[in-house]
Amino acid sequence: MNKEIFNSKLFEKLDKDNLIENSREWSNEIDSTWNYNDVVGILKSWESLNTISLEYIDSIVNCLTETGKDILINGSPEAKLYNILTEQGMSPADANKQFGATAFGSAKNKGWIEVKAGKIFKKVESINDIVKSDLSIPDLSKLDSKTLEQYKKSRFIEEKKLSYYRVTKGEQYNKRSKELSDLTIEMLKDDSWEKESFKVNINAMGVVPEQGYRHPLNKVKNEFKQIFLDMGFEEMPTFNFVENGFWNFDALFQPQQHPARELQDTFFIKDPKTSHDFSDEYCERVKQVHSVGGYGSLGWIYDWKLEEAEKNILRTHTTAVSARMLYKLAQNGFKPKKYFSIDRVFRNETLDATHLAEFHQVEGVIADVDISLGHLIGVISEFFKRLGIDNVRFKPAFNPYTEPSMEIFGYHPILKRWVELGNSGIFRPELLLPMGIPENVRVAAWGLSLERPTMIKYGLDNIRAIFGNSINVNFIKNNPICMFESK
């Protein structure tokens, strides 16, 4: 549309009548090809300058349906049936197939057609298509109420909600001037810009700046962290992705010939290949309990090797951090503690819908006098209850460093099966006593996956959709807020 012509017509109308009662009807009268959205855009630009005032009005109007528009062009169904008839006639079946039974009945009732020898023929020389005439009037609401209702039932006419503006003169109407689109150097030099009006709408929304987006896992991680803090836990430092085999395996009473310590399950560091950050006295006690036993245990009965314990690896679990914290706790004089950590761990696993080589582990440790497996089940159940996940199941299991041990499962509504969330249990005396932990102290611990509860909450069936190098960036930008409702 031509903006100059529009503005000319707009101000010509307001100068003459002081108002435009219906912006939609007025613009259609001026030029029916104008897009009404463009019309509204120009009106609002003048409103922003207080040149005009707009009053928004909703109205219910009667409009032609697609069927009604077809009648306006091609005639009513009964008229089309009449016009197609020839001297050879047409069978009622063909008529019904092409135009419907209603057209045949209506044409017959109006006396336009008749049936002879099983065929339809014209009964009159000419017809007056009243339906087409009725639908052609500009204001359909002027039809008598009975006819209007009949056409609505026939779905020729429908009611629509149409909005328009009542336009009147604004405070700055008489001060309007031609808007300039460019600010020139000359205007700045002679201050003439102060007298001009520019095409700038300071109330218009600017472009939303691109910004960083928090990863869904970080959102869930923060919720997990807050739940732990609310339950009285203290966060452990987990900044060491690289551990040696001593803290990751040996201190946890995991034998050196265990399959988890093989190349197919663990990532070994090439350089530096080894490290030694543990005391010789503690190392000797760990070696003793592995090799020949102690503290009421037979041990694993094998030749324990220091060089195996010194090998650097990418930690396979954050329980290595728990081992360091418990050892430190024992050296400084034991006090009951509740620790937690949430960080990355690494496993040389086969990738599938629920397994990654790099993922996050949620670790919890409770150290106190005479606690039991029942305490552990209660704490884990309460933790998941606060996450809003009630469908949790425990299953007896074996772990080298806990006895008794349990696997934790959660039901995945998308996969429609139970998904393993983590492991738990009571730390063995062979792990705790060499550290110097008192004999009457029990330590309950568990390791949970961060990704899998997140998958359940976000309704995902593939772990690679939420973490890893193949994640869709748009998922990070556009994912909805997913809150874990405390219960």
Curated annotation (Swiss-Prot):
Keyword vocabulary terms for this entry: Aminoacyl-tRNA synthetase, ATP-binding, Cytoplasm, Ligase, Magnesium, Metal-binding, Nucleotide-binding, Protein biosynthesis
Subcellular location: Cytoplasm
Main subcellular location of this protein, as a coarse class: cytoplasm
SUPFAM superfamilies: Class II aaRS and biotin synthetases (SSF55681)
Ligand binding (Mg(2+)): E403
GO molecular function: ATP binding; magnesium ion binding; phenylalanine-tRNA ligase activity; tRNA binding
Reaction catalysed by this enzyme: tRNA(Phe) + L-phenylalanine + ATP = L-phenylalanyl-tRNA(Phe) + AMP + diphosphate + H(+)
Cofactors that this protein relies on: Mg(2+)
UniProt GO BP: phenylalanyl-tRNA aminoacylation
One Pfam assignment: tRNA-synt_2d
GO cellular component: cytoplasm; phenylalanine-tRNA ligase complex
InterPro entries per record: aa-tRNA-synth_II, aa-tRNA-synth_II/BPL/LPL, Phe-tRNA-synth_IIc_asu, Phenylalanyl-tRNA_Synthase, PheRS_DBD3
Ligand binding (L-phenylalanine): T319, Q361, V362, E363, Y401, F427
Lineage top rank: taxon: Eukaryota
Subunit note: Tetramer of two alpha and two beta subunits.
Family: Belongs to the class-II aminoacyl-tRNA synthetase family. Phe-tRNA synthetase alpha subunit type 2 subfamily.
Protein name: Phenylalanine--tRNA ligase alpha subunit
Organism: Dictyostelium discoideum (Social amoeba)
Taxonomic placement: Eukaryota, Amoebozoa, Evosea, Eumycetozoa, Dictyostelia
